[in-house]
Amino acid sequence: MAKAIFVREHGSADVLRWEPSDPGAPGAGEAQLQHTAIGLNFIDVYDRSGLYSHALPLIPGREAAGKIVALGRGVRGLRIGQRVAYVLQTPGAYSQLRNVPAARLVPLPPGISDEQAAALMLKGLTAQYLLRRTYRVQAGDWILVHAAAGGVGLLLCQWARTLGAKVIGVVGHEDKVSLARRHGCRHVLVAGRDALATSVRSLTRDAGVQVVYDSVGHDTFFESLDCLKTRGLMVSFGNSSGPPPPMAAAELAKRGSLYLTRPSLFHYIESAAELKAAARELFAAVRSGKLKIRIGQRYPLADATQAHQDLEARRTVGSTILIP
């Protein structure tokens, strides 16, 4: 029988259990995938810990790649054996087999490996909408990227550089500085060592940045606001240090008539057409060499506990893949 990682109670990484799992036959409009690579993301930690509420038991994981092994009634345009990938709002990717709505599957083109796709569907599509839709980065823009050596951060910095932006990256440790520089950062700051707002003001000649991409949350929120230029945009899209603290709307005016948004990938790929258009642009950027996918760690799916512990301790670099 196939196996999966289960969460039967919310808590630390120790609650993850490797157990038998039978998804059954695919239903109408579904395809059954045999996973070949699964992406690890901080949202999986939020699901496991209970920050994001789901009914238990829960199989974590939002993105994966694999091959189709069965098709449900009414599915058109897909075939048995085809390589596909997905990102879903519903967890369930930490499994060897999974039934997935066929309309949410993206066929993989030549030149995109299963591991690349598993590292790209959530993180890469996140980078795509942040840079191309939430704020359309232009040549000459100063931008600030937190967690610049992480999976999303490395993609954001590379892509922004190809768009002509001047990228300031923030990393958690000294040993990640050179990696961030190689992936598009003009300047790299180290959290806890460099005074963030003071450093950004100095680098931008006191102008501030047009946009901050902040996936850290609680620990960086207010200082990120202080890095923005007048009418700048704060994009808060993650909670790796915990949710951002409460803030009165008047704070935005006091700091320069700032804009604040809290976007979600799934609102940018609501339709199949939006999903496939975003994936086409993303895959084209990878195949052209504009984006390099760094898979820094690979773990057997059965070792998901260790993978979660390393992610939470910030011992990972780039993307992390779980192998079923």
Language-model features: locations:
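Adenosine-nucleotide cofactor-binding segment
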Residues: 161-220, 271
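Short glycine-centered segments of the SAM/dcSAM-binding site in methyltransferase folds
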Residues: 83, 142, 166, 232-233, ...
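Glycine-rich beta-strand-centered segment in the early N-terminal region that forms part
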Residues: 22-39, 49-91
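Hydrophobic/small residue at the entry helix of a nucleotide-binding pocket
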Residues: 152
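Glycine-rich phosphate-binding loop and adjacent beta-alpha segment
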Residues: 171, 219-290, 324
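NAD(P)H dinucleotide-binding glycine-rich loop of Rossmann-like/cofactor-binding domains
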Residues: 46, 86-149, 159
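C-terminal hydrophobic helical "lid"/dimerization subdomain
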Residues: 272-324
